[in-house]
Protein backbone atom coordinates (compact mmCIF):
# COMPACT_ATOMS: atom_id res chain seq x y z
CA UNK A 1 0.00 0.00 0.00
CA UNK A 2 1.26 3.48 -0.88
CA UNK A 3 1.93 5.80 2.04
CA UNK A 4 1.79 9.59 2.28
CA UNK A 5 2.75 11.76 5.24
CA UNK A 6 1.11 15.15 5.81
CA UNK A 7 2.40 17.90 8.06
CA UNK A 8 1.47 21.46 8.95
CA UNK A 9 -0.09 23.18 11.93
CA UNK A 10 -0.15 25.94 14.48
CA UNK A 11 -3.31 27.50 13.00
CA UNK A 12 -6.32 26.10 11.16
CA UNK A 13 -4.97 27.77 8.01
CA UNK A 14 -2.01 25.39 8.10
CA UNK A 15 -4.31 22.37 8.39
CA UNK A 16 -7.33 23.09 6.18
CA UNK A 17 -5.90 21.98 2.84
CA UNK A 18 -4.53 18.81 4.42
CA UNK A 19 -8.00 18.02 5.79
CA UNK A 20 -9.42 18.40 2.28
CA UNK A 21 -6.76 16.26 0.61
CA UNK A 22 -6.49 13.38 3.09
CA UNK A 23 -9.95 11.89 2.35
CA UNK A 24 -9.05 11.85 -1.36
CA UNK A 25 -5.91 9.82 -0.71
CA UNK A 26 -7.76 7.49 1.68
CA UNK A 27 -10.46 6.89 -0.97
CA UNK A 28 -7.73 6.00 -3.46
CA UNK A 29 -6.28 3.38 -1.11
CA UNK A 30 -3.33 5.29 0.36
CA UNK A 31 -2.19 4.82 3.95
CA UNK A 32 -2.22 8.32 5.44
CA UNK A 33 0.00 9.56 8.28
CA UNK A 34 0.34 12.99 9.90
CA UNK A 35 3.31 14.48 11.74
CA UNK A 36 2.52 17.32 14.12
CA UNK A 37 2.24 18.39 17.74
CA UNK A 38 -0.29 16.45 19.84
CA UNK A 39 -0.97 19.70 21.73
CA UNK A 40 -1.51 21.62 18.49
CA UNK A 41 -4.64 22.48 16.57
CA UNK A 42 -3.63 20.00 13.86
CA UNK A 43 -4.21 17.09 16.28
CA UNK A 44 -7.55 18.53 17.42
CA UNK A 45 -8.76 18.98 13.84
CA UNK A 46 -7.76 15.46 12.79
CA UNK A 47 -9.53 13.96 15.81
CA UNK A 48 -12.66 15.97 14.99
CA UNK A 49 -12.54 14.87 11.34
CA UNK A 50 -12.76 11.19 12.25
CA UNK A 51 -10.45 10.35 9.34
CA UNK A 52 -8.45 7.12 9.30
CA UNK A 53 -5.12 8.89 9.82
CA UNK A 54 -2.21 7.80 12.01
CA UNK A 55 -0.90 10.79 13.98
CA UNK A 56 2.78 11.02 15.01
CA UNK A 57 3.62 13.68 17.60
CA UNK A 58 7.05 15.33 17.60
CA UNK A 59 8.84 18.05 19.54
CA UNK A 60 8.49 21.45 17.95
CA UNK A 61 9.85 24.91 18.61
CA UNK A 62 8.83 28.32 17.36
CA UNK A 63 11.02 29.97 14.72
CA UNK A 64 11.44 33.64 15.56
CA UNK A 65 12.78 36.46 13.41
CA UNK A 66 13.89 38.36 16.52
CA UNK A 67 16.28 37.68 19.40
CA UNK A 68 14.81 35.76 22.32
CA UNK A 69 16.40 33.54 24.96
CA UNK A 70 13.70 31.02 24.06
CA UNK A 71 15.38 30.60 20.67
CA UNK A 72 18.18 28.65 22.36
CA UNK A 73 15.75 26.11 23.84
CA UNK A 74 13.72 25.94 20.64
CA UNK A 75 16.80 25.12 18.56
CA UNK A 76 17.11 21.92 20.61
CA UNK A 77 13.38 21.22 20.24
CA UNK A 78 13.58 21.59 16.45
CA UNK A 79 16.69 19.41 16.37
CA UNK A 80 14.97 16.69 18.40
CA UNK A 81 11.91 17.03 16.16
CA UNK A 82 14.11 16.38 13.12
CA UNK A 83 15.54 13.23 14.74
CA UNK A 84 12.03 12.01 15.64
CA UNK A 85 10.77 12.73 12.13
CA UNK A 86 13.74 10.94 10.58
CA UNK A 87 12.95 7.78 12.55
CA UNK A 88 9.31 8.04 11.42
CA UNK A 89 10.36 8.41 7.78
CA UNK A 90 12.77 5.49 7.92
CA UNK A 91 10.16 3.30 9.59
CA UNK A 92 7.28 4.19 7.25
CA UNK A 93 9.21 4.65 3.98
CA UNK A 94 6.41 6.81 2.52
CA UNK A 95 6.17 7.69 -1.16
CA UNK A 96 5.93 11.42 -0.38
CA UNK A 97 5.45 14.16 2.22
CA UNK A 98 3.00 17.04 1.76
CA UNK A 99 3.48 20.12 3.93
CA UNK A 100 1.11 23.04 4.48
CA UNK A 101 3.57 25.04 6.53
CA UNK A 102 3.75 26.32 10.09
CA UNK A 103 6.63 25.81 12.51
CA UNK A 104 5.80 22.15 13.15
CA UNK A 105 6.38 21.33 9.47
CA UNK A 106 10.10 22.18 9.38
CA UNK A 107 11.47 19.01 11.10
CA UNK A 108 9.42 16.57 8.94
CA UNK A 109 10.39 18.41 5.75
CA UNK A 110 14.10 18.26 6.58
CA UNK A 111 13.83 14.62 7.67
CA UNK A 112 11.99 13.67 4.49
CA UNK A 113 14.66 15.23 2.30
CA UNK A 114 17.47 13.54 4.27
CA UNK A 115 15.74 10.16 3.94
CA UNK A 116 15.14 10.57 0.21
CA UNK A 117 11.36 11.16 0.40
CA UNK A 118 10.01 13.70 -2.16
CA UNK A 119 8.68 16.85 -0.47
CA UNK A 120 5.75 18.90 -1.80
CA UNK A 121 4.77 22.09 0.00
CA UNK A 122 2.01 24.67 -0.32
CA UNK A 123 2.20 28.41 0.36
CA UNK A 124 -1.04 30.37 0.78
CA UNK A 125 0.26 33.91 1.31
CA UNK A 126 1.67 36.52 -1.03
CA UNK A 127 5.02 36.32 0.74
CA UNK A 128 6.46 33.12 2.15
CA UNK A 129 6.41 32.50 5.88
CA UNK A 130 9.68 31.70 7.64
CA UNK A 131 8.82 27.99 7.93
CA UNK A 132 8.18 27.68 4.19
CA UNK A 133 11.29 29.72 3.35
CA UNK A 134 13.27 27.02 5.14
CA UNK A 135 11.15 24.21 3.71
CA UNK A 136 11.55 25.50 0.15
CA UNK A 137 15.28 24.71 0.27
CA UNK A 138 14.43 21.03 0.88
CA UNK A 139 11.34 20.81 -1.34
CA UNK A 140 10.87 18.95 -4.57
CA UNK A 141 8.13 21.42 -5.53
CA UNK A 142 6.09 24.25 -4.04
CA UNK A 143 2.52 25.13 -5.00
CA UNK A 144 1.50 28.75 -4.45
CA UNK A 145 -1.79 30.59 -4.14
CA UNK A 146 -0.24 33.86 -5.36
CA UNK A 147 2.25 34.30 -8.16
CA UNK A 148 5.82 34.20 -6.84
CA UNK A 149 9.13 35.57 -8.13
CA UNK A 150 10.37 33.87 -11.30
CA UNK A 151 13.68 33.19 -9.53
CA UNK A 152 11.88 30.57 -7.42
CA UNK A 153 12.24 27.80 -9.98
CA UNK A 154 10.50 25.10 -7.93
CA UNK A 155 7.24 27.06 -7.56
CA UNK A 156 4.07 26.37 -9.54
CA UNK A 157 1.31 28.96 -9.23
CA UNK A 158 -1.98 27.06 -8.87
CA UNK A 159 -4.29 29.65 -7.31
CA UNK A 160 -6.38 29.10 -4.20
CA UNK A 161 -7.86 25.74 -3.27
CA UNK A 162 -10.83 26.48 -1.01
CA UNK A 163 -13.26 24.45 1.08
CA UNK A 164 -16.30 26.47 -0.02
CA UNK A 165 -18.09 26.54 -3.36
CA UNK A 166 -20.81 28.53 -5.08
CA UNK A 167 -23.07 25.46 -5.04
CA UNK A 168 -26.20 26.06 -2.94
CA UNK A 169 -26.89 23.53 -0.20
CA UNK A 170 -30.05 22.89 1.87
CA UNK A 171 -30.37 25.19 4.88
CA UNK A 172 -29.51 23.52 8.23
CA UNK A 173 -32.27 23.63 10.86
CA UNK A 174 -30.06 25.74 13.12
CA UNK A 175 -29.78 28.40 10.41
CA UNK A 176 -33.58 28.66 10.23
CA UNK A 177 -33.65 29.34 13.98
CA UNK A 178 -30.96 32.01 13.64
CA UNK A 179 -32.81 33.70 10.79
CA UNK A 180 -36.00 33.81 12.87
CA UNK A 181 -34.19 36.29 15.15
CA UNK A 182 -33.13 38.52 12.25
CA UNK A 183 -34.83 41.46 10.56
CA UNK A 184 -34.87 40.57 6.88
CA UNK A 185 -35.08 44.24 5.90
CA UNK A 186 -31.60 44.82 7.34
CA UNK A 187 -28.26 43.81 5.77
CA UNK A 188 -26.46 40.97 7.54
CA UNK A 189 -22.83 41.45 8.58
CA UNK A 190 -20.63 38.48 9.53
CA UNK A 191 -17.47 39.02 11.61
CA UNK A 192 -14.90 36.24 11.06
CA UNK A 193 -11.69 36.34 13.06
CA UNK A 194 -9.98 33.13 11.98
CA UNK A 195 -9.87 29.90 13.97
CA UNK A 196 -9.47 31.70 17.31
CA UNK A 197 -11.80 34.60 16.59
CA UNK A 198 -10.56 38.20 16.76
CA UNK A 199 -10.66 40.15 20.01
CA UNK A 200 -10.86 43.45 18.16
CA UNK A 201 -14.05 42.33 16.38
CA UNK A 202 -15.50 40.90 19.59
CA UNK A 203 -14.81 44.16 21.42
CA UNK A 204 -16.34 46.25 18.64
CA UNK A 205 -19.54 44.18 18.71
CA UNK A 206 -19.68 44.27 22.53
CA UNK A 207 -19.07 48.03 22.72
CA UNK A 208 -21.53 48.94 19.96
CA UNK A 209 -24.09 46.14 20.20
CA UNK A 210 -27.05 48.53 20.36
CA UNK A 211 -26.03 50.66 17.37
CA UNK A 212 -24.98 47.68 15.26
CA UNK A 213 -28.14 45.65 15.85
CA UNK A 214 -30.33 48.66 15.05
CA UNK A 215 -28.80 48.90 11.58
CA UNK A 216 -27.67 45.34 10.78
CA UNK A 217 -28.15 41.70 11.60
CA UNK A 218 -24.85 40.76 13.25
CA UNK A 219 -23.13 37.36 13.19
CA UNK A 220 -19.95 37.23 15.28
CA UNK A 221 -17.69 34.14 15.22
CA UNK A 222 -15.85 34.87 18.45
CA UNK A 223 -13.64 31.95 19.45
CA UNK A 224 -14.94 32.59 23.00
CA UNK A 225 -17.87 30.50 24.27
CA UNK A 226 -18.56 32.97 27.10
CA UNK A 227 -19.85 35.40 24.45
CA UNK A 228 -22.36 32.97 22.90
CA UNK A 229 -25.71 34.68 22.34
CA UNK A 230 -28.75 34.46 20.08
CA UNK A 231 -31.03 37.47 20.42
CA UNK A 232 -32.78 40.08 18.28
CA UNK A 233 -30.57 40.76 15.24
CA UNK A 234 -27.55 39.14 16.91
CA UNK A 235 -25.89 35.72 16.77
CA UNK A 236 -22.56 35.25 18.56
CA UNK A 237 -20.92 31.83 18.61
CA UNK A 238 -17.44 30.62 19.46
CA UNK A 239 -16.96 28.05 16.69
CA UNK A 240 -18.87 26.49 13.79
CA UNK A 241 -18.22 23.65 11.36
CA UNK A 242 -21.25 22.65 9.25
CA UNK A 243 -22.71 26.14 9.71
CA UNK A 244 -19.61 27.88 8.33
CA UNK A 245 -20.59 28.10 4.66
CA UNK A 246 -24.32 28.65 5.33
CA UNK A 247 -23.42 31.65 7.51
CA UNK A 248 -21.12 32.93 4.77
CA UNK A 249 -23.98 32.66 2.30
CA UNK A 250 -26.45 34.31 4.68
CA UNK A 251 -24.24 37.37 5.15
CA UNK A 252 -24.43 40.36 2.82
CA UNK A 253 -20.95 41.47 3.90
CA UNK A 254 -18.16 39.74 5.80
CA UNK A 255 -15.65 41.56 8.02
CA UNK A 256 -12.57 39.39 8.23
CA UNK A 257 -8.89 39.15 9.05
CA UNK A 258 -6.53 38.87 6.08
CA UNK A 259 -5.65 35.18 6.19
CA UNK A 260 -5.41 33.79 2.66
CA UNK A 261 -7.73 30.84 3.25
CA UNK A 262 -10.65 32.97 4.40
CA UNK A 263 -10.37 35.75 1.83
CA UNK A 264 -10.13 33.26 -1.03
CA UNK A 265 -13.19 31.46 0.34
CA UNK A 266 -15.00 34.79 0.09
CA UNK A 267 -13.69 35.26 -3.43
CA UNK A 268 -14.97 31.79 -4.37
CA UNK A 269 -18.54 32.75 -3.47
CA UNK A 270 -18.20 36.40 -4.61
CA UNK A 271 -19.07 37.70 -1.15
CA UNK A 272 -18.59 41.39 -0.31
CA UNK A 273 -15.94 41.80 2.37
CA UNK A 274 -13.89 44.24 4.43
CA UNK A 275 -10.42 43.01 5.39
CA UNK A 276 -8.95 44.13 8.72
CA UNK A 277 -5.47 42.57 8.60
CA UNK A 278 -3.29 41.73 11.56
CA UNK A 279 -0.72 44.49 11.93
CA UNK A 280 3.05 44.09 11.72
CA UNK A 281 3.29 44.29 15.50
CA UNK A 282 1.39 40.97 15.71
CA UNK A 283 2.55 39.25 12.51
CA UNK A 284 5.12 39.34 9.73
CA UNK A 285 2.80 41.56 7.67
CA UNK A 286 1.47 38.83 5.37
CA UNK A 287 -2.15 39.77 6.02
CA UNK A 288 -1.45 43.41 5.14
CA UNK A 289 0.03 42.24 1.82
CA UNK A 290 -2.90 39.92 1.16
CA UNK A 291 -5.38 42.72 1.87
CA UNK A 292 -3.56 45.19 -0.39
CA UNK A 293 -3.60 42.63 -3.21
CA UNK A 294 -7.36 42.10 -2.89
CA UNK A 295 -8.03 45.85 -2.80
CA UNK A 296 -5.86 46.36 -5.90
CA UNK A 297 -7.80 43.63 -7.72
CA UNK A 298 -11.09 45.30 -6.80
CA UNK A 299 -12.33 42.35 -4.74
CA UNK A 300 -12.56 44.03 -1.33
CA UNK A 301 -12.05 47.06 0.90
CA UNK A 302 -9.49 47.11 3.70
CA UNK A 303 -9.26 48.88 7.02
CA UNK A 304 -6.21 48.89 9.28
CA UNK A 305 -6.88 47.74 12.84
CA UNK A 306 -5.63 51.05 14.24
CA UNK A 307 -8.30 52.83 12.17
CA UNK A 308 -11.15 50.47 13.07
CA UNK A 309 -14.06 52.33 14.66
CA UNK A 310 -17.80 52.01 14.27
CA UNK A 311 -17.85 55.04 11.96
CA UNK A 312 -14.94 53.90 9.78
CA UNK A 313 -16.40 50.41 9.46
CA UNK A 314 -19.86 51.70 8.55
CA UNK A 315 -18.30 53.88 5.87
CA UNK A 316 -16.71 50.78 4.29
CA UNK A 317 -19.93 48.75 4.62
CA UNK A 318 -21.97 51.50 2.98
CA UNK A 319 -19.48 51.81 0.12
CA UNK A 320 -19.52 48.07 -0.56
CA UNK A 321 -23.31 47.83 -0.48
CA UNK A 322 -23.72 50.77 -2.84
CA UNK A 323 -21.17 49.30 -5.30
CA UNK A 324 -22.17 45.66 -4.84
CA UNK A 325 -22.44 44.79 -8.54
CA UNK A 326 -18.97 46.17 -9.36
CA UNK A 327 -17.22 44.17 -6.63
CA UNK A 328 -19.12 40.97 -7.36
CA UNK A 329 -18.44 41.22 -11.10
CA UNK A 330 -14.69 41.45 -10.47
CA UNK A 331 -14.76 38.51 -8.06
CA UNK A 332 -16.78 36.36 -10.45
CA UNK A 333 -14.33 37.14 -13.26
CA UNK A 334 -11.33 36.02 -11.17
CA UNK A 335 -9.14 33.20 -12.49
CA UNK A 336 -7.34 32.71 -9.17
CA UNK A 337 -9.25 29.69 -7.88
CA UNK A 338 -8.64 25.98 -8.35
CA UNK A 339 -11.09 23.23 -7.49
CA UNK A 340 -10.05 20.62 -4.95
CA UNK A 341 -10.54 17.90 -7.57
CA UNK A 342 -8.24 19.66 -10.05
CA UNK A 343 -5.54 20.26 -7.44
CA UNK A 344 -5.71 16.66 -6.28
CA UNK A 345 -5.26 15.42 -9.85
CA UNK A 346 -2.28 17.78 -10.31
CA UNK A 347 -0.69 16.57 -7.07
CA UNK A 348 -1.21 12.90 -7.97
CA UNK A 349 0.35 13.51 -11.39
CA UNK A 350 3.40 15.12 -9.76
CA UNK A 351 3.70 12.22 -7.32
CA UNK A 352 3.78 9.62 -10.08
Curated annotation (Swiss-Prot):
Residues annotated to bind UDP-N-acetyl-alpha-D-glucosamine: 195, 287
Any GO CC annotation of this UniProt entry: plasma membrane
Record carries keyword ATP-binding: no
EC number(s) per entry: 2.4.1.227
GO biological process: carbohydrate metabolic process; cell division; cell wall organization; lipid glycosylation; peptidoglycan biosynthetic process; regulation of cell shape
Catalysed transformations (reactions): Mur2Ac(oyl-L-Ala-gamma-D-Glu-L-Lys-D-Ala-D-Ala)-di-trans,octa-cis-undecaprenyl diphosphate + UDP-N-acetyl-alpha-D-glucosamine = beta-D-GlcNAc-(1->4)-Mur2Ac(oyl-L-Ala-gamma-D-Glu-L-Lys-D-Ala-D-Ala)-di-trans,octa-cis-undecaprenyl diphosphate + UDP + H(+)
A Pfam family of this chain: Glyco_tran_28_C
Main localization of the protein described in the UniProt heading: membrane
Membrane topology: Peripheral membrane protein
Pathway: Cell wall biogenesis; peptidoglycan biosynthesis
Keyword Glycosyltransferase found: yes
GO molecular function: undecaprenyldiphospho-muramoylpentapeptide beta-N-acetylglucosaminyltransferase activity
Location(s) in or outside the cell: Cell membrane
Entry keyword set: Cell cycle, Cell division, Cell membrane, Cell shape, Cell wall biogenesis/degradation, Glycosyltransferase, Membrane, Peptidoglycan synthesis, Transferase
HAMAP family membership: MurG
Family: Belongs to the glycosyltransferase 28 family. MurG subfamily.
Function: Cell wall formation. Catalyzes the transfer of a GlcNAc subunit on undecaprenyl-pyrophosphoryl-MurNAc-pentapeptide (lipid intermediate I) to form undecaprenyl-pyrophosphoryl-MurNAc-(pentapeptide)GlcNAc (lipid intermediate II).
Protein name in UniProt: UDP-N-acetylglucosamine--N-acetylmuramyl-(pentapeptide) pyrophosphoryl-undecaprenol N-acetylglucosamine transferase
Amino acid sequence: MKKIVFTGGGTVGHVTLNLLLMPKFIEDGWEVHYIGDKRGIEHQEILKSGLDVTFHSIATGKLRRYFSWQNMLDVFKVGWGIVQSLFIMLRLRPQTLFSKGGFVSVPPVIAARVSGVPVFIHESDLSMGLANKIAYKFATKMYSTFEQASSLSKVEHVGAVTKVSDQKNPEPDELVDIQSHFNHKLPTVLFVGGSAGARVFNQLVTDHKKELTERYNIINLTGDSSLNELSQNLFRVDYVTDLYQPLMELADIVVTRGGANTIFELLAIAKLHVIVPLGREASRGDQIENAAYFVKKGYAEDLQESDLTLDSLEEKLSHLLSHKEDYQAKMKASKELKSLADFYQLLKKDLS
